[in-house]
């Protein structure tokens, strides 16, 4: 199937409300992607029945002082080819309110978050891949002292225009030794740890499925000159694995190990990586 790009339009408005009157500022952008498709006999692909497909997004953000609220309106009429067909219709799946002050950052509504390398928690958006698994709930970030960053959250994961049945609870702490102890020199040290728990009610009378599944991770980042090392270990417990039968409940722990070593200088970059993932 061959596609013809009819229109890809982005509009950005930096100011819609004058800040001189102390009313705050409204920012926004609008994007629409319309595509038309034709038959491609070489791969036996047929054109879409709708002739024209469209993905459109409208973002609106209001900001005043330390306070921000925003929303995103999404329209899939119908979704572009290669997008999941469950992206269909119109709605406002993303809206939030956020307040920041003196090391405190509070968000209610939708938000994106990643702990470490994302082994046990990664809520992110990539419209090009058709991925948006934002969390809807409450997130708290706090910096009690220089170099210590704490995050706590609870929410439900977005699934297209709905939300999953499970509830995600998580906490993360990152400790930058150089910032906390005012260390000087070329070497920087950052330690981190995370904990995530998922609750999902067991509505299956045939199996004794765990309603709470937990995962934890620890990470280390060392930077020296052009060298950068990042390592993280994650462990998950109490989760079903493989097929489950009436006479056997298969529960197993999972683990993942990530090691990244990079070196860079002008005109040269070297990366060595190793990833091990089992039942995560």
Please describe what each predicted stretch is.
Residues 1-27:
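Bacterial Sec-dependent N-terminal signal peptides
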């Amino acid at each position: 199937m061959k596609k013809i790009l009819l229109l890809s339009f982005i509009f950005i408005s930096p100011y819609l409300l004058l800040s001189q009157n102390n009313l705050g500022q409204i920012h926004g952008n609008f994007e629409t992607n319309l595509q038309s498709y034709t038959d491609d006999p070489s791969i036996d692909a047929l054109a879409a029945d709708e002739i024209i497909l469209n993905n459109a997004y409208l973002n609106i953000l209001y900001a005043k002082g330390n306070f921000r609220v925003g929303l995103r309106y999404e329209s899939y009429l119908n979704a572009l080819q290669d997008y999941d067909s469950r992206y269909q219709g119109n709605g406002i799946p993303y809206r939030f309110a956020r307040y920041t002050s003196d090391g405190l950052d509070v968000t209610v509504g939708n938000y994106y978050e990643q702990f470490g390398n994302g082994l046990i928690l990664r809520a992110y958006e990539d419209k090009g891949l058709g991925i948006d698994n934002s969390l809807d709930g409450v997130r708290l970030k706090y910096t009690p002292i220089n170099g210590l960053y704490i995050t706590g959250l609870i929410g439900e994961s977005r699934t297209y225009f709905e939300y999953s049945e499970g509830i995600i609870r998580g906490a993360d702490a990152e400790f930058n030794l150089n910032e906390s102890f005012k260390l000087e020199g070329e070497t920087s040290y950052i330690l981190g740890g995370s904990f995530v728990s998922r609750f999902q009610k067991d509505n299956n009378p045939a199996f004794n499925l765990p309603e709470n599944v937990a995962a934890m991770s620890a990470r280390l980042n060392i930077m020296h000159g052009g060298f950068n090392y990042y390592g993280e270990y994650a462990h998950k417990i109490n989760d079903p694995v493989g097929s489950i039968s009436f006479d056997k409940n298969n529960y197993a722990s999972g683990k993942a190990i990530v090691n990244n070593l990079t070196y860079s200088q002008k005109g040269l970059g070297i990366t060595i990586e190793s990833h091990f993932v089992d039942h995560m």
